[in-house]
């Protein structure tokens, strides 16, 4: 059986032309080492393009690499891919003649998940799905919770490593992309075969990742078998009233279509969910549910008529029959992903409504000359833009425009600085309310909250939204637009001095007992774990032993928890001790908040329907 017939047998589909090209190239690097970049629009079958050469080894018995390590940016994406790949493994085992019971048993052993809560942490499954942070610490022979020794490092060296959704590996200081670029360099030197997959990626990010000199595998115009998706109409509205929202949802449901509403923050998602849940079978999905509740919601997602979610649905989620997507304005790459959730199959028709920032009338009248909607409104030639923390205004964009002035017959370049903030910034909002907008420096502002996103990226994305439907289908146009959006972001991004305290460890792959200090400050995926528990205070008083169940944990952003920490009136830390009977868990009053710890909160702060309530 050749690889094409193998693919047909386990997927019931004909392969696309680009997938066959990818398999040929991946087969070569599995033997000799190297890099492959796959750049395909959403719903184009990238996963199969990357993993089929490895899976085919189970049939051909021609083993070039013994292990596949599949790296994703978030745990939710890992969880989504696990069953998909396990199902392929089950079909392979059935082809090889295993019984149904044995197929189930072996599939679980062959496909392993690794992101910090499992009993073993050695990267020793045939197929290992993991998050970027876990992969990085495994390579450095360290784990943030417990010991890992050097097993994962050895396992990685003998694997085909796939980095999926790499457009999501970004943060304010570009710390993660820089580390990935560093790791890629080391892995290439060790002849580890690497595959990178994305739908959209700025050119400068490719340079940081160290993959800019690789010709990407993509869909060619002359391909006869290629991914095709449905027709999507994109509308833009500056305001969507509750009545309009209700009417749009009812219309879509009456046509037998699903509705997907994507909000930028958890709080705004909950607010919209409460408004629309009576209109049909509704489901709320975001990052602040327990592992068990989130898994249940993801299982039920196909039954829901209305799905309200945050960024967790931007990538890796294959929703069928979505006829209406309503989304907040977001960075261009995220917006392309969101629109890509709609009408994913050939023959489907769908509608997307992008809700543009709502212009507050009072601000509009009183401060019209201070408002910036997008950079198109600023006439400049030479400009430098970066994010700074200004003592008067908080986090703002610093825009420096160079002008040429003539004085006494001589020309000289005169830089002028402007500060631009967004109305999500509490400091700026307070200044506006108190009518103290002029203070030391002129303050211009974006008339909407850009949280949780970089305001610089948001106002550049605002300038591109009218053409976003084109970018869904055309990779080249999408890349050119992303280069425009991220131009200043990358050009002006300065490497923080204390970054090197972490950099040196990973550059030399040194062992370390605790993460470098900058590592704890800079990583956006740094987390803590919350565990809702009934009568937690009583259990502490009575010194009860706690039966810890990983299904009830909620992994939250460390930075988010730091901002909310004082709002939890009762919080405790989980203590794990080992004796001859195994692990014993008890509680103590929580001290200073630290990343990667497990904190117990009262179950009054948690709802199965809406998640953490705070």
From Swiss-Prot:
SUPFAM superfamilies: P-loop containing nucleoside triphosphate hydrolases. Pfam families: Cas3-like_C_2, DEAD. Its EC number is 3.6.4.-. One of its GO terms (biological process) is defense response to virus. GO terms for molecular function: ATP binding; catalytic activity, acting on DNA; helicase activity; hydrolase activity; mRNA binding. Residues 27-219 form the Helicase ATP-binding domain. It is an enzyme of class 3 (hydrolase). CRISPR (clustered regularly interspaced short palindromic repeat), is an adaptive immune system that provides protection against mobile genetic elements (viruses, transposable elements and conjugative plasmids). CRISPR clusters contain sequences complementary to antecedent mobile elements and target invading nucleic acids. CRISPR clusters are transcribed and processed into CRISPR RNA (crRNA). Cas3 plus Cascade participate in CRISPR interference, the third stage of CRISPR immunity. Probably unwinds dsDNA templates, thus providing substrates for CRISPR-associated endonuclease Cas3-HD. Proteins of this family have an N-terminal nuclease domain and a C-terminal helicase/ATPase domain. In some CRISPR/Cas systems the domains are swapped, in others they are encoded separately. NCBIfam families: cas3_core. Belongs to the CRISPR-associated helicase Cas3 family. This is CRISPR-associated helicase Cas3. The lineage of its organism: Archaea, Methanobacteriati, Methanobacteriota, Methanomada group, Methanococci. The gene is cas3.
